[in-house]
């Protein structure tokens, strides 16, 4: 598709799901999507994550899911959510040059602050990777993975829930 249109990116508009049961700590949903392939120059520190949802998953841990489409959040602060529940739709808001999901776990209920917490994904399929020239490279050793965290540049797929 046209790399200058957010809507032409495969991930754009995809459902963003809760990765664990928890309570919504905060929601930002009013920031604009940025044009793809252009680094934004007019956003402040508070807008770096763009539209986002922060989940309190207990034990002092918070999940930050960022770069959602404006107005797409389906939850509000204080809502209880369950793993797999739709939180919003993937967009290109904040400090980003193309639609993608920013996800991290930290010990603070604020965007991009606090100590990061290591985590693993319970199951996914490793498909390949993206090389330095942004080309897809299949495998090697493509297939199912459990309790791992994909490396940077990995292309993965999530199988349907059993």
Residue ranges and their predicted role:
Residues 22-24, 78-90:
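A structural signal for short beta-strand/turn segments enriched in small hydrophobics and glycine
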Residues 30-32, 87-95:
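Short, charged beta-turn/beta-strand-edge "cap" motif at the junction between a beta-strand
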